Amino acid sequence: MAKYTEEELLQLKPTYDVAVNFDVDAFKAMIAEVAEHHEIADLFHQKARRRSSHHHGVKPKIKAHKPRITTDDDGWCTSTRKTSVVAVGDDGEPSPAFVAQETLRVKPNNKNIASSRPADTRDIVADKPTMSFNAFAALESDDEDQF
C-alpha cells in the first residue's frame, strides 16, 4: 500500500463540496445500523472447522457386562454369567435350538485363473496334497558321513 505525506494528501483532497441536500445524520445512522447487523451476524456465525473423519456412521458401543459375583456363607465367591435366552418347554427343560440347514455354494474367482476355460467348483473345494522341499532334510545327507 502506498504511503503519502501530508502535503500529497492535501493535494489529492477533492476540490468539490458535498451536495447541499445530503443528510449526514441519516448516513451515519445507516452506517451504525449496518455495523450492528454485522456484529449480530458474527456473533452467531460458526467458523469453518475441519471436517471430522468419523461422521459416516455411529461407532458401536461395545460394553462387556461384568459377571455377577455372589459370596457364600463360607466366604467363597462365585461368578455367574447372565444366562442366554432359550425357549423353555412345559417340563422346565430348555428345548434345543434349531439350526437352519443351509447349502454352501462355492463361487470360483475366475479373474485370477489364466485359462479361458471356467473353473470347476470340484477342483476348488478339493484340497490336493502338495510336495514341499525340506531344506533341513537336504542338509542332512548320508554323503557327508563318508568323508
UniProtKB/Swiss-Prot annotation:
Record's keyword terms, sorted:
Cytoplasm, Initiation factor, Phosphoprotein, Protein biosynthesis, Protein synthesis inhibitor, Translation regulation
List membrane-spanning regions.
none
The UniProt GO MF terms for this protein read: eukaryotic initiation factor 4E binding; translation initiation factor activity
InterPro entries xref list: Caf20 (IPR031456)
Any one GO CC term of the record: cytoplasm
Q: List where in the cell it is found.
A: Cytoplasm
| A single GO BP | negative regulation of translation
Record-stated family: Belongs to the CAF20 family.
Q: What is this protein called?
A: Cap-associated protein CAF20
Q: State the gene name recorded for this protein.
A: CAF20
